[in-house]
Amino acid sequence: MSVSTSSKNTLLSSIISGILSLVIFATLRFCADWFNGSQLNVLVGGYLFSWLFILSLTCVSNAEMLIFGPDFQAKLVPEILFCLSLTVAAAGIVHRVCATTSVLFSLVGLYFLNRISIKYYSTSVVPVDAPARKTAKKFK
């Protein structure tokens, strides 16, 4: 049984994004007191938690691609809402306002990820002109 290169890349990407999301959560949890310092610190925390969302979504999506096949795509209801609620809960542990700003930054990041994926992975259909039908001559 041989494993294809794309399967290896998907597995490696899933592992790396999972480890990085755990490292980000542990670091932000460890530095939770720093977020009480100023409003700018809270915004930075929300931005960093949005990276936690993106990395956890990458981990979950790549794991599902390994299980269900390479054509599987993450949908809004199960994957995106699960990762977003997980991120909001983790950010709420650190600071309540971090949870709110992380939702906003995560939605902006999700918008740009969607634009990038449409640009690189969508198949564009070339329109084919249908031959013109011959119409009967109209007599006046």
UniProtKB/Swiss-Prot annotation:
The chain crosses the membrane at residues 11-31, 40-60, 74-94, 98-118. It is found in: Membrane. Signal peptide: none annotated. Its main location: membrane. Keywords: Membrane, Transmembrane, Transmembrane helix. It holds the Pfam family Keratin_assoc. GO terms for cellular component: membrane. It is a multi-pass membrane protein. Subunit of the oligosaccharyl transferase (OST) complex that catalyzes the initial transfer of a defined glycan (Glc(3)Man(9)GlcNAc(2) in eukaryotes) from the lipid carrier dolichol-pyrophosphate to an asparagine residue within an Asn-X-Ser/Thr consensus motif in nascent polypeptide chains, the first step in protein N-glycosylation. N-glycosylation occurs cotranslationally and the complex associates with the Sec61 complex at the channel-forming translocon complex that mediates protein translocation across the endoplasmic reticulum (ER). All subunits are required for a maximal enzyme activity. Component of the oligosaccharyltransferase (OST) complex. Belongs to the KRTCAP2 family. PANTHER family: KERATINOCYTE-ASSOCIATED PROTEIN 2 (PTHR32001:SF1). This is Protein KRTCAP2 homolog. It comes from Drosophila pseudoobscura pseudoobscura (Fruit fly). The lineage of its organism: Eukaryota, Metazoa, Ecdysozoa, Arthropoda, Hexapoda.
